[in-house]
Amino acid sequence: MFSTDLTNKILFEPLQSGMDELSILSAYATPNMLSWYIKNLFHKTASPIKINLIVGMVPFDNLSVSVHEGFQQIVSSDLPHEVSAVQCSYVIDKPAEHSNLFIWSRQGQPQTAFSGSANFVQSSFVGNHRRELMMQCDPAEASEYYD
């Protein structure tokens, strides 16, 4: 269990082990965080990664047009060579999904995963805006839950 250095432990260190796909299930997520992450991948990976994002609380809190358009713009934009593809989808049927999972895979096989309170938003990963608690979890179980 850990509450410090989440950005490196969850978003960047797994890249050093040759991971090529990050699947994120987040209760809340923003295009700003996705854009920040893509920009900060610069020179941090030897081969391009695929990013899959599912935003879970849409049935409960809805999603603004500007947030949806922000995700659309990122998904359809020219990506840097560090990113092979970005997919973004939303849970639209109830019940809403309040879980937060970050699953790293290599060649389609889940290798490491994290769960906890950190949403995929900048206030969880950038700066010291609030405390978050995350833990490693079983990657196969996390992947099964994600799917």
Segments predicted by a language model, with ranges:
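PLD/PLD-like phosphodiesterase catalytic module centered on the HKD motif
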Residues: 1-147
